[in-house]
C-alpha cells in the first residue's frame, strides 16, 4: 500500500472578491495510453457512485465519474484509486498518518482554471510511483481573494512546504513577511515576472526568454511574430521585440478565421523567421497557410507553448519542413510518465505538469528526505529552476 497520503480540502469562499541549444528529432510515435470507457448511457449521480464503491465496482466507478462531482469523499476515492491505493470502505476517507513530512498544494481553482486538474493529476502520478512517507494535502480555494486565509490555515496545521500554482497576482500575498518560514514552490511562473521575491520562494516556470534566444540562433535578420492577444502571447512578443526591435508583430484574435488579410501579399513575412506565439490550433493553421499564400519563411519558430505532438500531426511534412520548436524538458522517469498517462497527463509535453512534479521531487529529495537521489537533472539557480533548452525539428 502506498505510503503517501493524499488529502483534499476544499476551501471555497464566496466573499467578493542553463541554456545550450541543440537540434533534435522529435518522434511522432504517440505514447501508449489507458482509458476507462463509460458504456452506461444513464448518468451516475452521487448516490450511484457510492453504490458502485460499496459493491467494489472500481472500474465502473472510474469510468462514470464526472468532472462536475464535488463530493469530497468521492473525490478522495477517485484519486486514491488512480494512485493505486486500496479502499476498504465506501466512504473512502483517508486517515492521516503520523508523518513528520507534509506538503501542502495550494490551488486557486478559478484563477488557474484547467491547470488545477493538471497540477493535481501530475502530483498523483508522482506519488503513485514513490515509496516515501509523505502526507500531501490539497487546499483548493476560489482565487487570490481567499489565498491569505487559506495560507494561514495550512500554516496553522504545521505545513512548511507548499506547491503553489498561482498567477503573478498572488505574488505579493505569499511574499508577506508573516510567511517567511514557509517554503513556496511556484510551477506556473518564471522568476523574471517577479519584481522582487524572498529566499523562501522558488520558481519553476518555463524560461521563454532563453527559448526565444535559442530559436534566434536559427533565424535570419528578418524577424516576424504572430500573437493571439493572450497575456502569455503578449509577453512572448515583447521578448521577441527585446531581441529584435525591428520585428514585425501581428496579433490575430483567436475568434478570427480570416487569415487572408494577415498573410496575402505580406512582404514582411516573405523569407522571414516567423515566431508563432499563439495557441496550438492557431499555430498549426498559420503554418499550413503560408504555402497557400505563396509565403516562404526562412524558418518557423515555436516556443514551449506549441511543443506538442498534436502540432506535428496536424501539419503536413511540407508545412513543418522549416519548423523548429523549443522545449525545456529533460528526461523523465518512465514509471511517472506511464502513471501520468493513465491520469490524462503527458509529462513530456505539458508545460505545467513537468515543473509541478519537479518541484515535488525537489522538496522530497532536498528537504524531507535529504540525500535521496533526485529523479530530475535540473538544478535551482537564484530561486529559479535552471532548464536546458532543446530545439526540435
Kindly give the residue locations of the regions a language model identified.
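Extracytosolic ligand-binding ectodomains
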Residues: 2-10, 18-393
Amino acid at each position: 500500500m502506498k505510503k503517501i497520503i493524499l488529502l483534499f480540502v476544499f476551501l471555497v469562499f464566496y466573499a467578493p472578491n542553463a541554456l545550450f541549444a541543440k537540434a533534435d528529432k522529435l518522434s511522432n510515435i504517440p505514447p501508449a495510453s489507458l482509458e476507462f470507457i463509460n458504456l452506461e448511457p444513464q448518468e451516475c449521480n452521487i448516490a450511484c457512485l457510492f453504490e458502485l464503491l460499496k459493491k467494489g465496482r472500481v472500474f465502473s466507478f472510474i469510468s462514470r465519474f464526472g468532472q462536475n462531482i464535488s463530493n469530497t469523499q468521492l473525490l478522495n476515492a477517485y484519486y486514491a484509486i488512480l494512485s493505486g491505493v486500496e479502499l476498504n470502505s465506501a466512504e473512502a476517507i483517508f486517515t492521516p498518518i503520523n508523518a513528520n513530512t507534509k506538503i501542502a498544494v495550494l490551488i486557486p481553482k478559478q484563477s488557474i482554471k484547467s491547470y488545477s486538474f493538471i497540477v493535481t493529476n501530475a502530483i498523483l502520478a508522482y506519488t503513485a510511483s514513490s515509496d516515501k512517507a509523505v502526507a500531501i494535502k490539497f487546499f483548493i480555494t476560489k482565487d487570490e481573494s481567499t489565498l491569505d486565509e487559506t495560507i494561514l490555515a495550512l500554516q496553522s496545521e504545521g505545513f512548511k512546504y507548499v506547491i503553489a500554482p498561482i498567477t503573478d497576482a498572488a505574488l505579493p500575498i505569499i511574499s508577506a513577511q508573516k510567511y517567511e518560514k514557509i517554503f513556496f514552490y511556484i510551477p506556473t511562473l518564471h522568476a523574471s515576472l517577479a519584481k522582487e521575491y524572498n529566499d523562501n520562494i522558488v520558481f519553476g516556470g518555463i524560461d521563454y526568454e532563453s527559448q526565444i534566444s535559442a530559436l534566434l540562433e536559427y533565424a535570419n535578420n528578418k524577424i516576424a511574430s504572430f500573437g493571439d492577444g493572450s497575456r502569455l502571447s503578449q509577453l512572448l512578443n515583447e521578448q521577441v521585440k527585446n531581441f529584435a526591435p525591428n520585428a514585425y508583430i501581428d496579433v490575430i484574435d483567436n475568434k478570427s478565421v480570416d487569415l487572408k488579410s494577415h498573410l496575402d501579399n505580406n512582404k514582411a513575412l516573405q523569407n522571414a523567421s516567423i515566431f508563432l506565439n499563439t495557441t496550438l490550433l492557431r499555430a498549426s493553421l498559420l503554418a499550413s497557410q503560408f504555402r497557400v499564400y505563396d509565403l516562404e519563411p526562412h524558418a518557423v519558430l515555436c516556443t514551449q507553448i506549441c511543443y506538442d505532438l498534436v502540432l506535428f500531426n496536424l501539419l503536413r511534412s511540407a508545412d513543418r519542413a522549416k519548423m523548429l520548436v523549443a522545449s525545456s524538458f529533460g528526461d523523465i522517469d518512465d514509471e511517472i510518465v506511464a502513471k501520468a498517462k493513465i491520469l490524462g497527463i503527458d509529462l513530456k509535453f505539458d508545460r505545467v505538469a513537468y515543473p509541478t512534479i519537479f518541484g515535488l521531487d525537489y522538496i522530497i529529495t532536498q528537504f524531507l528526505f535529504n540525500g535521496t537521489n533526485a529523479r530530475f537533472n535540473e538544478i535551482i539557480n537564484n530561486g529559479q529552476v535552471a532548464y536546458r533548452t532543446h530545439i526540435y525539428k
